[in-house]
């Protein structure tokens, strides 16, 4: 089967799939006929089986593994569009995108949900787990995709990035800007790296531009509305 989806209202992706999971996942993202795809991807049964073999959880299906493989295949082709996949949650607030990332289990979803509650009616999710980050005309944007985590927080939207914030747990709520060297040490763990050497060189240049042009912060916080206030007061003014 073939599915087409429009990512962030700008990039049309066509994927060939075996299991109906993908069709359901992309249902609200599908476009009418007439769009020429920017990216076309498909994955093999061997790739699906390799992905499946890497999981031990009984709840993981081959259909879910196919979805993971397809997004990985998409990520490999994004460099041609000055874009990459990042692990993180992105909120849109007053026309700006705020990117939050953290080590697994720290609580980026919990923190971003607090933002949505705190700024009721103003803040919304662009993507809750794996957004596409893209440089367009010298400006960095975050894009929603159908791959948005188990909570399915996200939308078919995009916004220019205001700031990127690394979340850590803390008893008190503190935020500080960090230098490029520390940014590199932290952010590269959250990016999808292409495998082939030529694409990797191009990717590294793109990632360097990402680090140079955007402000990065570390937020040490607890689970409270004050954590949102402390973060917003700094991030919104950069």
Whereabouts are the PLM-identified features?
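Glycine-rich, often acidic-flanked micro-motifs
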Residues: 14-21, 53, 60, 88-89, ...
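Conserved lysine of the Walker
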Residues: 108
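Intrinsically disordered, low-complexity, positively charged segments
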Residues: 16-35
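P-loop NTPase catalytic core of nucleic-acid-dependent motor ATPases
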Residues: 59-97, 101
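Short, small-residue-biased leader/transition segments that mark boundaries at the very start
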Residues: 1-13
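Post-Walker A alpha-helix
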Residues: 111-112
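Walker A/P-loop nucleotide-binding motif
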Residues: 104
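Charged, amphipathic alpha-helical linker segments immediately N-terminal to NTP-binding catalytic cores
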Residues: 32-75, 235-238
């Amino acid at each position: 089967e073939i599915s087409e989806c429009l990512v962030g209202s700008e990039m049309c992706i066509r994927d060939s799939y075996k299991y109906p999971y993908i069709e359901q996942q992309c249902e609200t993202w599908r476009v009418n006929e007439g769009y020429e795809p920017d990216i076309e991807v498909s994955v093999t049964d061997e790739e699906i089986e390799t992905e499946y073999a890497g999981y031990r959880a009984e709840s993981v299906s081959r259909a879910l593994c196919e979805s993971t493989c397809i997004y990985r295949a998409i990520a490999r082709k994004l460099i041609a569009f000055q874009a990459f996949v990042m692990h993180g949650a992105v909120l849109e607030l007053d026309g700006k995108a705020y990117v939050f990332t953290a080590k697994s289990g720290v609580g980026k979803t919990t923190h971003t949900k607090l933002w949505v509650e705190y700024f009721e009616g103003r803040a919304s999710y662009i993507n809750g787990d794996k957004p596409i980050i893209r440089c367009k005309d010298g400006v960095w944007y975050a894009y929603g995709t159908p791959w948005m985590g188990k909570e399915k927080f996200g939308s078919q939207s995009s916004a220019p990035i205001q700031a990127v914030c690394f979340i850590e747990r803390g008893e008190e709520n503190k935020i500080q800007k960090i230098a490029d060297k520390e940014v590199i040490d932290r952010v590269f763990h959250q990016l999808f790296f292409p495998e082939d050497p030529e694409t990797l060189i191009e990717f590294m240049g793109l990632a360097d531009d990402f680090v140079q042009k955007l402000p990065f912060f570390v937020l040490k916080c607890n689970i409270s509305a004050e954590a949102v206030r402390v973060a917003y007061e700094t991030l919104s003014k950069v």
